[in-house]
C-alpha cells in the first residue's frame, strides 16, 4: 500500500445533492469528482438504492475504523480478514469488533457469508470470484461490479489494472489507470461502455445492484444484452470515464482524510 495518501480537498459537498460527513472534513460521496450529467444520474440512483439518509444514520468513528480495516484486509489478505485480525488492526476489543461488524452488515457496508458468517466483501472489494479482477501493489483482488473496479484505484491512491469481460459476449476488457487511480490511461477495446442498472433487493447490493453494473465491449452488445435479459430496465449507459467518476465519488473518500490531516494508511 502507498506510504502517503492524497489529501482530501473537502470540496465534495454540493448544495442540493445527498451527502454526509464520513469523518471530519470528508464528505461522502465526493460530488466534486462527478462532472457528467449521466454520471450524476447514475450516482444519484445508487445512493437512492442504498437509502443514504436511513442506512448511514448514526454511522460513527468505530464503525468507520472497522470498515476501513475490512477493506484493507480484503486487499492485503488472500482470504479476507476476520474479527481477530481487525481487532489487531484497529486496537478495538474483538467482541466490540464483532458487534460493529454486525452493524456494518445491517447497513450493507460489509457482506458476510450466509452460512459461515465469514466476511466476504466490503464495497468495492470481495473475496468471491467476479468478472472484475483489479491488480495493484503486486496483488490481485476482485471488485463487486464495474463501477467498484473503476473506483478502487482512487480509494487506494494507486494505479490499477482492471481485467474484466463483456457481460454479453465474454470478450476480454482491460482498463489501466493513471495519476494514482483517478484517470484512465487505456481502455481496450476502445468502444467499451458501462451499464449502471437500478436494482436493489434483499438489503444487499452485492447480490442485486452489483449484478447489473457491468462492462460491455460495445454499445451494440449492451443493447443486445438488454433486449435479451432486461428489456425496459432502468439504468444509465456510461462511458468508462463517466463510470470512473461515479467510482471515484463513492470510494475516494473511504480511506482518506481532510486536507492537512495525517494519512491513516502506513
Q: In which residue ranges do the predicted regions lie?
A:
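Long, low-complexity, charge-rich intrinsically disordered regions
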Residues: 2-38, 141, 158-161, 172-266
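Short alpha-helical segments that sit at the start of domains
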Residues: 37-68
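Short, cationic-aromatic polyanion-contact patches
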Residues: 57-63, 114-137, 179
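Short acidic, hydrophobic short linear motifs in intrinsically disordered regions
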Residues: 76-90
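Short amphipathic alpha-helical interaction segments
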Residues: 91-106
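A short, conserved structural fragment
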Residues: 105-116
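Short, amphipathic alpha-helical interaction segments positioned at domain boundaries
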Residues: 122-159
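Short cysteine-rich clusters marking metal-coordination/redox-active sites
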Residues: 166-169
